[in-house]
Each structure stands twice: as C-alpha cells, then as structure tokens.
Amino acid sequence: MVRRHFPGRAIVKVLTSHGYRLVGREGSHVRLRWDPPDQHDSAVRLVSVPVGHEVGGDTLRNIADQCGADDFDAFCTWIERNR
C-alpha cells in the first residue's frame, strides 16, 4: 500500500532536489517554484507546502496537483522513494 502522509519538510527536500527552488515563506508554509526548461511545453509551477506537520489527505493531493502530477499514488511513491 502506498504511504499518503509525509512530513512537510520531507516534501520540500524532495522537490528542491528535483529542480524546485524556495521563493518565499508565509507563516508555516513555504513557496516553491519550478521553471521548465526551454524545450519543455509546461508552464511555471508554484507550490505551497506546510512544513510544520505531517501532510496528507487533500493537502497532499493539492500539492501533487500543483506539481503537475497525473497520478496521485505515483506521486506519493516518488516522494517516498526520494525522501
């Protein structure tokens, strides 16, 4: 079964190690930005991640959507494998 709860800091660590960069902080949330390579047809992605607690449920699903994930379970597996 796929794990669906992760510490916010672990999510930030995985995303920043895969091209996202920290662009701001508001309260307990950090803002990350991914700029696509020139040959990529995707738009810039902005992601907000709460870092003070475990992230799961709809919040984790929203983060996956903001990252452009098509498959939520695959996104969770990717986070688990890279944390």
Briefly describe each language-model feature range.
Residues 41, 53-54:
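Short, surface-exposed loop/turn microsegments at beta-strand edges and helix-strand junctions
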Residues 23-42:
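Major-groove DNA-recognition helix of helix-turn-helix-type DNA-binding domains
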Residues 54-83:
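C-terminal structural segments of small proteins and small subunits
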Residues 18, 32, 80-81:
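Flexible domain-boundary/linker segments
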Residues 44-46:
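Short, mixed charged/polar active-site loops
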Residues 3, 36-40, 74, 80:
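Short alpha-helical interface elements
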Residues 1-26:
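N-terminal first-folded block
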